[in-house]
Amino acid sequence: MNVLISNDDGYLSEGIAVLARVTAEFANVRVVAPERDRSGVSNSLTLERPLQLKQAQNGFYYVNGTPTDCIHIGQSVFSDFQADFVFSGINRGANMGDDTLYSGTVAAATEAYLMGMPAVAFSLNDASGRYWATAEQALWTLLAHFFKNPPQSPILWNINIPAVAPEDVRGIKIARLGRRHHGQNVIPARNPRGEQIYWIGPVGEVSDREEGTDFGECEAGFITVTPLQIDLTAYRDMAETAVFWHTD
């Protein structure tokens, strides 16, 4: 079995090293990741310039583009490697609730799913760097189960690992996406020349962390698995929309 691995934190991140190291115990691995941090780029493609693929000393490949670019290149340019599965991560920080719409980590998995492959995005609910041992232990548990009976059809799973000590992980729960309040979207400032500039502000506070949500269960110490879908059609609003537009 072949697994293509990517992320949005870049090929030098700790998370992708952990993911590649553990996955290599179960399958053949090829890493194709952005050359730098591309967090928050979602499913964007690089269309205004050509891309380059280079190989680092550790064997990882890197691209001067987005996570989505990396999936396309990883599946297109290697005659000796065609992926059966795509793993993305492990992201330094959670990707839960509305965050999944912006996440390059989730986007890499999404693109693979659109290409017909089973895909999984992994994130650690911590940005301090203190819980990589937890992430690695959780990954061993998750992948041992995954490869015992691998999915045969395309799936898209978003997995978040809690920020607790390894011995305090309480298990695995299937969870729905929670929600956030809108954050302070734009922060005005001045550059050293006195010119007006703007920063995109921090994310908002969690507004839905009820039991059964990814926020709630992960904060309670569980590894959360959320099955995602791509179809954005609001089927329950179809009839009402037809009435508004006076269609038959």
UniProtKB/Swiss-Prot annotation:
Gene3D superfamilies: Survival protein SurE-like phosphatase/nucleotidase. A divalent metal cation binds at D8, D9, S39, N91. The keyword Glycoprotein does not apply. Coiled coil: none annotated. Signal peptide: none annotated. It is an enzyme of class 3 (hydrolase). It comes from the Bacteria. GO terms for molecular function: 3'-nucleotidase activity; 5'-nucleotidase activity; exopolyphosphatase activity; metal ion binding; nucleotide binding. It catalyses: a ribonucleoside 5'-phosphate + H2O = a ribonucleoside + phosphate. Binds 1 divalent metal cation per subunit. SUPFAM superfamilies: SurE-like (SSF64167). It holds the Pfam family SurE. Its cofactor is a divalent metal cation. The keyword NADP does not apply. It is found in: Cytoplasm. Belongs to the SurE nucleotidase family. This is 5'-nucleotidase SurE. It comes from Neisseria meningitidis serogroup A / serotype 4A (strain DSM 15465 / Z2491). The lineage of its organism: Bacteria, Pseudomonadati, Pseudomonadota, Betaproteobacteria, Neisseriales.
